[in-house]
Every structure is written in structure tokens, then in C-alpha cells.
Amino acid sequence: MSKVHYHFDHVGSYLRPQALKEAREKFANGEISQEELLKVQDELVKELVHHEVENGLQVVSDGEFGRSWWHLDFLWNLTGFEAYQQEDSYKFHGAKTRTTNVRINGKIAENPNHPFYRDFEYLKSVTPEGITPKVTIPSPSLIINRDHRSDLYADYYDSWTDFLDDLAKAYHDTIQHFYDLGARYVQLD
């Protein structure tokens, strides 16, 4: 019988600290630079990793502090996708949320400059020896089966199979890139 390598203590997403929310708002209003925003984010990630390790976790995440959504930021930054404003907002526990979504706008591919790579490299740099830093990304099913995100595939692909092949390759190449950066735990949500 094989032994399970990890015990799963958390998904990886944490509530965003108030300091991060405020820094994001200042960035959106042009009051601070992206570099200043990342400085705040990095300090909070460092504190979170310390807290995770202090509480006995052997696998740590960056809390997804670099994201505004748990899934959309990743997709917006793949080649061949764009953000847009949909008519209706998401519904979550009866509350309305933002109306931002994602849709196809070209051939799909890995983005070698994806900001999640930078975030992982920072996470890895503040993760103590013997602790595993993990990456979380949304599964490709969020493109295929949700919110009409794949409806425009025929504008860019000759067939559904060609679209799926490129989507699979984009994920493969992205995960390989994370691996090349030292990631040994990539979680698809």
C-alpha cells in the first residue's frame, strides 16, 4: 500500500489583510506604484508564511494575496484571455460581487511573464527549509464549463478539439514553468 505524502490542512486562500486591501485601493487610485503595492504584499506574505509554519503546517501558501479573485487573475494572465465586464455579478451568499469575468480573445498559450511566477518565487524565498511552498491555480474546467467563458472558441479555433489542445498545452507549460522555478506542489482548484 502506498503512503500519502501530504496531509491537507488548508486550501491555500486566506482572507486578505486590511493593509493589503488599503494598498490595493491606493494602487487603483494611482496613489502608490505597483512596486509599493508589491512591497506591502510581500511583507504580508512573509508574515503569513511565518504564521503557517508556527502553527505546524508543512505546506504553505502565499494566501493568494497577489490576487483579486481566487481564479480570474490566473486566467486573465494566460495568453489568449482578457478581462471584461459582464452584465450580472457573481452571487455569493446572497450578496452581489464585482462583474469582472474572463473570455477568450485569441489563441491560448502559457504566458512566460505570468505574475504568478513572480509571486511563487517570492513565496519560495521566504519558505523555511523543510517546508513546501505550494501554488494554487484554477482548473481548466473553469474555462470549459462555466459562465460561457469558452463560447468564443470558434472565433479563434477550427474545432473544439483544437481549443482544448491549446488549453491543455497552456496548463502543461504553465505547470512546467512552475516546476522549473522549484514548485513541487501545484494545486488545481
Identify the function of each model-found stretch.
Residues 1-189:
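Domain-level signal for soluble alpha/beta catalytic cores
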